[in-house]
């Protein structure tokens, strides 16, 4: 089972649909309705932290999940979820000089990694 922690963003259900194409069982839980202990009891194979409003420290159980389970369970963060992962591991989260929400731009992959196998560079991302 993949656990999708919903940070109160409608895109969480887009993620649910996309992940549902490759995963049989997905459980969606809001970030303020579950504890780390309950997550452990669910025994997820992986955890996805959804986008959402605000800052990582406002994302309910997410930072505690990363701190306590990140070394045991694979975690993918999208937007706010990604910011939460970065902040837990020491990054400083700041506002971008130019708002890019919903806009796309080209990126270049600068390091070889199996993570990027088969991905063309440069590529357009949002």
Language-model region placement:
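Cysteine-nucleophile active-site neighborhood
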Residues: 44-113, 118
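Generic structural signal for residues in well-ordered beta-strands
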Residues: 26-28, 93, 125
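Active-site oxyanion/phosphate-handling segment shared across diverse enzymes
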Residues: 119-126
